[in-house]
Amino acid sequence: MIKSLSRKPGFALAALAVAVATAAPTVSAQEELEEVIVTGSRIPVDSNAVSSVPIQAISEEDIRNAGEINIADIVADIPALVSSLTAENSSTGANALNLRGLGGSRTLTLVNGRRHVAGFRGSQAVDVGSIPRALVKSVEVTTGGASAVYGADAVTGVVNFILRDDFEGLQVDLSTGRPERGAGETTVLDIAWGTNFAGGRGNAVLTVSAEDDGGILYGERSWSRNNGIATTLNNPDPNGPPRAVVNDPRYWLTSHEGSIAPGFGGRGNTYVDINGNGIADCQESEGGRVGYLAGCWLTNPDGSVRVNQDGVLIDGLFGTGGDGAYADHNSDTLYPETDRQVVNFNVSYEFSDTLRGFLETKYVKAETNTFSEYDGFFDTLEITPDNPYLPAELQPVMDQVGYLIFTKDALDWHEDGSEYTRETTRVVAGLEWQPSEDHMVEFSVNQGIFEQKSESTSILLDRFYAAMDTVADANGNPVCRSDLDPTAAYPIDYFAWANGYTEGSFYSDRYYTFTPGDGQCQPLNPFGTYA
């Protein structure tokens, strides 16, 4: 049995010297002192009492009484960690601790005092959701900077998860939860089995966990339904405070149905008055006066058009009410749906009173699904004079200008979903050697592998632009121009041109996913919803 005043694991191939406080009481040679793990301190005391750095500790009893399914939610209740990334506000369902709000990469997360492989692409932050809750004995949070001890990634502090190494028996925990408002059901199954061997000199423990988070959509909560989440924006009232709480926030420069404006250079002119109120349509709204990035008219579900209505404009992008595009939609993901499986196997063995070996292995697989009702953002699409879908009300405008500009934040062109699969593998093996009562040396090898795969739906731009470029064939039926003339260039929007989709003009003759003229292109009617 290894006996010492303090043990602080966490450095591979490094010797850790423990200094005994001068104020400590004298200890007789016959007394055996209990082993104590203290994170971020070289003084062997209760981490909640006295330490050379600020430390907060969460005990096994605290974890059990918290009633939380995810260990990250328990730790995030500490005031210094309230800025942490949890599954509720993560698009991938991952969890990252964030001390003092300075970022997860500046908070060092350890398991048994040893480093853990990152759980995010391009970041050093650890996915805390991969730590087996059933084995957590305590959590120690060093809220002071610990760069001198642990390096630059511990600028804001250290969070150390200490796992049980003496588990014996079988423990099965099944937890389920369902919010009172419905949706978001959660089920977690934890199975832990452990045994001592070799007369108590060794211990082996295996844990298997399965977690199913049902997820919540915006439309499944009254406070978020129908674009109901209020936000703070610039106050349009010059006599009020600079910021105001605004309900029903919208992007007034665009719409879901499709905003229509005269071609470039034609904005603000008096073309038609389709609602017959004596005011030219393009003068009835700020969107009409702006023109090409907004519009004078909007399409109706049946393909007809109406005059654009502004609502209350807040700034150059946001407003409330009117015909602008919603900020949020009922089918958008509010809380992601996540399935997670964790398998953890640890072994420790005391070769002698001064030498102990350990092995920690873990495999985690998590799958997260999110959904957004937005299909894409398409601005300044060109509608040509020979487009057979052109509404009759706008034919006079087309005759004067020569083409129309179409902008749409589409909801009806395809379903936009994303699936994230994350796999984490971690293996740590090492030896702890205690040559004397106040010295400890640890030799360890730590290997971790993190892989993330993401799949999402998107629109194939060459097919989309070709489908938008619709003309009538000899029989008057709508067809793609590329089927009649495979050499024809199709119009693209301004932003595709600016991003190098083509060069020199707002047209492209590049086809990446189909051969023009092969009959694959299906004409798209931009006027009307689900047309």
What feature does the model see in each segment?
Residues 1-32:
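Cleavable N-terminal targeting peptides that direct proteins into the secretory/outer-membrane pathway or into
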Residues 31, 102, 126, 134-137:
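Structured loop/turn residues at beta-strand edges in well-structured enzyme cores
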Residues 31-43, 287-291, 298-299:
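Short N-terminal segments immediately surrounding and downstream of signal-peptide cleavage
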Residues 35-66, 119, 170:
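N-terminal periplasmic "start-of-domain" segments of outer-membrane beta-barrel proteins
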Residues 73, 77-79, 85, 93-94, ...:
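Surface-exposed beta-strand-turn/loop segments characteristic
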Residues 109:
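Short aromatic-centered micro-motifs
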